[in-house]
């Protein structure tokens, strides 16, 4: 058997070469795996970011859709309300038979509908056939009389027990104040007279006197709560004006 040293070297070199090739391939595989591992995280991060962006866009789309629906509904409600308001204005602008009757008979409006179509001026109170003003200006009896005249009225004249009850109810809410009425006399020895010249009847109410030795001549009358007194005409007080009207 011949010995071939070159073949041995080839075998040895071949083996060695193959060994080196195997190691080289192993290193390349390891490097490839490391490279793929290193490249993986950026792609995952990008995928997560894209997912979040998609979710945000979806939420925005839902919100915008909801707002659009709400605006559409509110717009339709506004148009509907405007329609009813315009219809109400048309109805109120058209006079009816009842409104014409109320304008002719104002007291009917007060009694039946409560609408303020009163023949009385502002701040006056209507009762039966008269308007009343409870003036809060302090004046003597003569000054109060002039004030009522300037307003086209007279100081109060009480004609009935019902009217007296109405006046008492009004002044009782001001227990610290007294109010001049249209009852006076020129001197102590003569009867009491209303402003229209008619004589006072004690059957309606009694006049309590405040006469004293110092003030012997109280020739004017005022009402305090539910009691009617004579008083010096020069004493400042409030007053009640009355204006009658035809039914």
Curated annotation (Swiss-Prot):
(1,3-beta-D-glucosyl)n binds at residues 146-153, 195. Coiled coil: none annotated. Keywords: Cell membrane, Cytoplasm, Disulfide bond, Glycoprotein, Immunity, Inflammatory response, Innate immunity, Lectin, Membrane, Metal-binding, Phosphoprotein, Receptor, Signal-anchor, Transmembrane, Transmembrane helix. Highly expressed in peripheral blood leukocytes and dendritic cells. Detected in spleen, bone marrow, lung, muscle, stomach and placenta. It is found in: Cell membrane. Glycans are attached at residue 91. Residues 1-44 are cytoplasmic. One of its GO terms (biological process) is positive regulation of canonical NF-kappaB signal transduction. Homodimer. Interacts with SYK; participates in leukocyte activation in presence of fungal pathogens. Interacts with CD37; this interaction controls CLEC7A-mediated IL-6 production. Lectin that functions as a pattern recognizing receptor (PRR) specific for beta-1,3-linked and beta-1,6-linked glucans, which constitute cell wall constituents from pathogenic bacteria and fungi. This is C-type lectin domain family 7 member A. It comes from Homo sapiens (Human).
